[in-house]
Design a protein with these regions (language model features):
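Boundary-proximal intrinsically disordered activation/regulatory segments immediately upstream
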Residues: 1-67, 155-156
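Short acidic-hydrophobic, aromatic-tinged amphipathic segments that line or gate anion-handling sites
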Residues: 3-10, 79-84, 175-186
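Short, aromatic/basic amphipathic alpha-helical patches
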Residues: 66-77, 239
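A glycine-rich helix N-cap at a beta->alpha junction
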Residues: 74-93
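Structured adenosyl-cofactor binding patch, chiefly the S-adenosyl-L-methionine
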Residues: 102, 140-144, 158-172, 237-274
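RNA substrate-binding interface of SAM-dependent RNA methyltransferases
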Residues: 107-209
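Active-site/ligand-binding-proximal alpha/beta "capping" segment
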Residues: 202-253
Length: 274
């Protein structure tokens, strides 16, 4: 393991941490060269457990023989760039989460069909662009038994830095895939693929034809896809029209909606396979 003391972040090797945008890190033109950033020893360890390849670390000096020692022992070939906390804060402009960042190679993408052959309960996300919500949804999906998460092409990347952090690494534990290559593939193309895989689809939406989330018919479905929409407007009408069910969560005190991550958690628990 090579440890390099730094005094500035202008060297090209540190560009993933300091200069590259999320889009540049993802590298859509050459996805095999894509990178993501994992933060904190716990999240980095979860990514390593999932087989992700570490490229380098940026961390406070005290982390090397402290909380990061365990993950560093698993990455003997990775370069570690280090400095004191005060230096890193000045250079990066923010405090590192738990003092450790790791640049890692993006895993090879999978198709929905590869992931969902034996799945019984999956989450399908439409147009969710808030990375905090993406991370929270993945954490709920992992905790509450979803077999996979599928995303419309307009969703935020689950491997963007904040989504990875908020998910507490569960983006590496729950299989996920994007339903199509462009927004034009959703909803018609994506819904057709879900139905071809044998899923009944349940749109979480306020609608006159909506059934309650505790409707017995939902629990009898062998393969059910729970479809969640954007933070503001929810699912588009065309998506709802393509779904087999429209489902609502009964609420009290005049509340008519929940944050999408909270609504997802309720739906995942109530509609889990039993």
């Amino acid at each position: 393991m090579q440890i390099i003391e730094i005094t500035d972040l202008s060297i090209p090797e540190l560009a993933p941490y300091t200069k590259l945008t999320e889009s540049q890190l993802r590298n859509r033109l050459e996805p095999e060269k894509g990178i993501f950033i994992a933060e904190s020893p716990k999240v980095i360890g979860t990514a390593l457990d999932a087989g992700c390849e570490p490229l380098s670390f940026l961390m406070e000096r005290r982390q090397i023989d402290g909380p990061a020692a365990g993950v560093l022992a698993r990455c003997p070939d990775a370069t570690v760039y280090t400095a004191d906390r005060s230096v890193l804060q000045v250079l990066t402009g923010y405090v590192l989460t738990r003092g450790v960042l790791c640049a890692m190679r993006r895993p090879a993408p999978h198709t929905a069909e590869e992931l969902c052959g034996n799945a019984h309960r999956i989450a399908v996300l439409e147009g969710i662009v808030d990375s905090t919500n993406i991370g929270a949804i993945f954490r709920g999906a992992a905790a509450l038994g979803m077999d996979a998460v599928l995303l419309s092409p307009s969703c935020c990347d689950p491997l963007c830095r904040r989504a990875v952090r908020v998910s507490m690494g569960t983006v590496f534990q729950v299989p996920w895939a994007v339903l199509g290559d462009s927004p034009a593939d959703w909803p018609e193309g994506g819904m057709a693929r879900l139905h071809a895989m044998g899923f009944k689809t349940a749109a979480m939406a306020l609608d006159n034809r909506a059934v309650s989330i505790d409707d017995p018919a939902l629990h009898t479905e062998d393969k059910l896809a729970i479809v969640l929409g954007t933070e503001g407007d929810g699912l588009v009408h065309n998506t709802i029209a393509h779904c087999d069910y429209t489902v609502m969560i009964p609420m009290q005190h005049g509340v008519d909606s929940l944050n999408v991550a909270a609504a997802g958690a309720v739906a995942f628990w109530e509609l889990r396979k039993r």
